C-alpha cells in the first residue's frame, strides 16, 4: 500500500479516535491502534510506537490535500493533553519535524500551541544532539543550501 494512502488513512483514523468515534476496525486495517487507549501514542503492536503529534507532523508533509485534517488531529491531540514537545525515536519534537520538512505554517502552528523552540534535541545522532530549533534550522540551511528555508527562518525568528 502506498505511503501516502497509509498516511491519509492514518490521519482520518486518528481524527476519529481522538473525537471518540468508533473507528477501531478501520484503524486495525492499517495495523495501528492507540497504545493503551491513549490518544497521544500509536502502535502496531509489533514494536512500532510513535507519539501522535510528531507522527502527524510527518503526515502533514505528505498530505498536501488533507493538511486541514492533519491540523485537526494535531489540535485534538493537544486538547487531549498530549505533550506538544514529545519527541520521536530520533529525538525530533513535532517542531523539529516541521522544520526538517520545511513547513513554515506547521512551525507557526506548533509555536502558537506552545512548542518550545529552545528545547534541545536529545539524540544518538551527534550531528543534531543538543541543538535547539534555531540551531537545527541553521544546520539544515548549511547542509542543504539549495532548499529555500527563508520563510521558515522568518517564522522562527518571531519566537526568538
Predicted regions: what they are:
Residues 136-160:
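Terminal, low-structured helical/coil segments at or just beyond the last alpha-helical repeat
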Residues 72-84, 108-117, 153-160:
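Ankyrin repeat domain, specifically the short helix-to-loop turn at the C-terminus of the second helix
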Residues 22-24:
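Boundary at the C-terminal end of the N-terminal hydrophobic targeting segment
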Residues 1-8:
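Bacterial N-terminal signal peptides that target proteins for export
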Residues 8-15:
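Hydrophobic alpha-helical targeting segments used for export or membrane insertion
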Residues 26-29, 35-67, 87-97, 120-140:
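Ankyrin-repeat boundary/"N-cap" motif
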Amino acid at each position: 500500500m502506498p505511503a501516502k494512502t497509509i498516511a491519509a488513512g492514518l490521519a482520518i483514523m486518528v481524527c476519529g479516535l481522538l473525537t471518540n468515534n468508533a473507528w477501531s476496525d478501520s484503524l486495525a486495517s492499517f495495523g495501528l491502534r492507540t497504545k493503551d487507549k491513549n490518544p497521544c501514542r500509536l502502535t502496531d503492536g509489533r514494536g512500532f510506537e510513535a507519539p501522535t503529534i510528531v507522527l502527524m507532523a510527518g503526515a502533514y508533509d505528505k498530505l498536501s490535500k488533507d493538511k486541514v485534517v492533519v491540523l485537526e488531529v494535531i489540535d485534538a491531540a493537544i486538547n487531549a493533553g498530549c505533550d506538544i514537545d514529545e519527541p520521536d525515536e530520533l529525538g525530533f519534537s513535532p517542531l523539529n519535524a516541521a522544520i526538517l520538512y520545511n513547513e513554515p505554517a506547521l512551525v507557526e502552528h506548533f509555536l502558537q500551541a506552545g512548542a518550545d523552540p529552545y528545547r534541545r534535541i536529545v539524540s544518538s545522532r551527534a550531528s543534531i544532539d543538543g541543538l535547539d530549533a534555531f540551531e537545527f534550522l541553521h544546520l539544515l540551511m548549511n547542509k542543504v543550501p539549495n532548499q529555500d528555508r527563508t520563510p521558515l527562518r522568518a517564522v522562527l525568528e518571531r519566537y526568538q
